[in-house]
A protein has these predicted regions:
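Terminal, charged accessory segments of proteins
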Residues: 1-138
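Short, mixed-charge, low-aromatic patches
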Residues: 14-16, 88-92, 107-113, 159-168, ...
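Short, charged/polar micro-motifs that form catalytic or ligand-binding hotspots
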Residues: 119-126, 192-200, 258
Length: 362
């Protein structure tokens, strides 16, 4: 165990050191990698994308090479124990330096593939980012010592530069008192539907609305804000969000803006069964017109494997709760969602989307 902790600490120190060096550099310090060069384009394709995992794969591979010069990330990616060194070391270094990342980025992208090659890249999205990972790591592995060091330094410089672009992004401010409650509610809901951020934004909005609705009551709202910040754990949850009174669960909610299949219901049943909540009411908050086409729903409900599932429309649910909130609670919801979007782990695409909807309301 001590060896594992020591290795993870070494990985964390390595990434911290490389990013520390990157902060002292400028683009002019890398004349061989000017815009239009192969390496510049490869790093643009793998770093400046919404998917965080490709950056995580490369950081993990470079850290593995630092810890073991015989490590071959292209043919034995899992040979460096990527989960351990990323979650136990690299992740902390990235967080400390404000670099966007998830808790298990490299594993989410590698998907148990030991070989990172063109065949692997074809199954990833975006494929251009995956291909860039393969080609860049190939350049690193084949390079002589000095060239390898330059390639690695430039990667961390570009990674740091990208993180600064995100942290410096100016998000439009909105004032809840200046516009109709339903007007702003509609815009906020439409924003979360157009830029769902892998489903995190709709889930977060629902959690905030429920929290605002029940803030002065004995009901506690649990869940809804973990995954985007990399704080999710492997422990099983009964649902995305649930309500409790004095620690006793009363209602469960699944929030999705993707089509719901029977497999999705099976997954829900498994979660309910494994957590001992099979007899509690559960509601799917979804896009009724799009997400339940493959289900034989009647009057908003479906009995499946002796379990009743209820379904309500995401937009109607949100707008109804907006109408029930006080002015103060409405303002809190807007402020919290804006803070959520401002977080470094939210993509530039989604931040730009926020400004698309709310620019001019400040």
């Amino acid at each position: 165990m001590a060896n594992i902790a020591e290795r993870n600490n070494s990985g964390q120190y390595y990434v911290n050191t490389r990013l520390g060096v990157a902060k002292t550099k400028k683009e002019e310090d890398f004349p061989e990698f000017v815009e239009g060069s192969e390496v510049h384009k490869l790093l643009t394709d793998l770093i400046e994308v919404n998917a965080k995992g490709f950056r995580g794969v490369v950081v993990t591979a470079l850290t593995g090479l630092h810890l073991n010069e015989h490590y071959d990330p292209l043919n034995d990616f899992y040979g460096c124990n990527p989960r351990s060194i990323f979650e136990g070391g690299i992740w902390y270094a990235l967080q400390e330096n404000g670099v966007p990342c998830g808790k298990s980025d490299p594993l989410n992208v590698a998907k148990n593939a030991n070989q990172l090659n063109e065949d692997w890249a074809q199954g990833r999205r975006p494929q251009s980012a995956a291909t860039a990972v393969v080609r860049y790591l190939r350049l690193v592995i084949e390079a002589k010592r000095n060239k390898r060091a330059r390639l690695i330094d430039y990667f961390f410089f570009r990674l740091w530069k990208f993180s600064q672009t995100i942290s410096d992004f100016r998000l439009a401010e909105i004032k809840s008192s200046d516009y109709s409650r339903q007007t702003q509610g509609n815009k906020l809901v439409d924003f979360t539907l157009k830029y769902p951020e892998s489903g995190n934004l709709p889930q977060y909005l629902i959690a905030q609305l429920l929290s605002g609705l029940f803030r002065t009551s004995k009901i506690d709202v649990v869940g809804g804000d973990e995954s985007v910040f990399g704080t999710n754990t492997t422990s099983k949850k009964p649902a995305d969000i649930w309500l409790e009174i004095d620690g006793n669960l009363i209602n469960l909610y699944e929030v999705t803006v993707k089509p719901i299949s029977l497999k999705r219901l099976d997954d829900s049943l498994d979660a309910l069964h494994s957590t001992g909540h099979l007899n509690y009411p559960i509601t799917f908050i979804c896009r009724i017109d799009l997400d339940v086409k493959d289900l034989n729903i009647s009057n908003g409900s479906l009995y499946y494997k002796k379990k009743k599932f209820d379904f309500v429309d995401y937009k109607y649910f949100c707008l109804s709760v907006f109408s029930l909130l006080s002015d103060d609670e409405f303002s809190i919801v807007l402020k919290n969602v804006a803070s959520f979007v401002k977080d470094k782990n939210i993509s530039i695409k989604t931040k730009s989307g926020w400004n698309e909807f709310f620019e001019g309301e400040s």
